[in-house]
Amino acid sequence: MRPSGIRKFFDLAAEMPHCISLGVGEPDFKTPWTIRDAGIRSLEQGRTRYTANAGIKELRAEICRYLARRMELNYQPSEVLVTVGGSEAIDLTIRALVKPGDEVIIPEPCFVCYEPITSLTGGVPVHIATKAEDDFRLRADQLRAAITPRTKLLILPYPNNPTGGVMDAADLEAIAEVLRGTDIMVLSDEIYAELTYGLDRHIS
């Protein structure tokens, strides 16, 4: 397994004075104090012990409220699993769904972890090159051409890292139409849902 090229650039940039690193996807501002204060309060209250495997129930309930408010999606806390980060969630999802020989469709450019995790499960990464003239959106005809009888999973990484591309409602409906009647699962990586620019707005 090759080391991450992005992490290599991150390490190099850290050693160069006055270098602005674009190597990892994180904001250029510090964590807001409302979040820091909540973390400090949690530590002061001794909330440092093991939780339920799925995560703290109150947190899962709050995630459900966020999804309803922001994405108009309705879930119950029993349907939510809290992980230590986005990469772990991606890893667990791919490991749960993909068996040796299964194909995983990955639009590119993309986050670096999709391919190695797929390979570790014995799955086969199938790359689709999105184009600048399409604003790096996955087109339905590209997806249709990539599907085979071995296709198990489509990764939808939008808003996209690193391009910032966003799929609109018509794009998503066209993708859904291609997948209707199949057993293909979708991993929707929406970690950058709140980081869109201009008039673009993320639709889950």
Describe these PLM feature segments.
Residues 1-85, 92:
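N-terminal small-domain helix-loop-helix segment of the aminotransferase-like
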Residues 16, 121, 181-182:
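Helix C-cap/helix->beta junction micro-motif
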Residues 74-80, 100-103, 150:
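Short acidic capping loops at alpha-helix termini that bridge into adjacent secondary structure
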Residues 96-118:
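Conserved PLP-anchoring active-site segment centered on the Schiff-base-forming lysine
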Residues 120-126:
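A short helix-loop-beta submotif of the ANL/AMP-binding
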Residues 126, 130-201:
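Active-site phosphate-binding strand-loop segment of PLP-dependent enzymes
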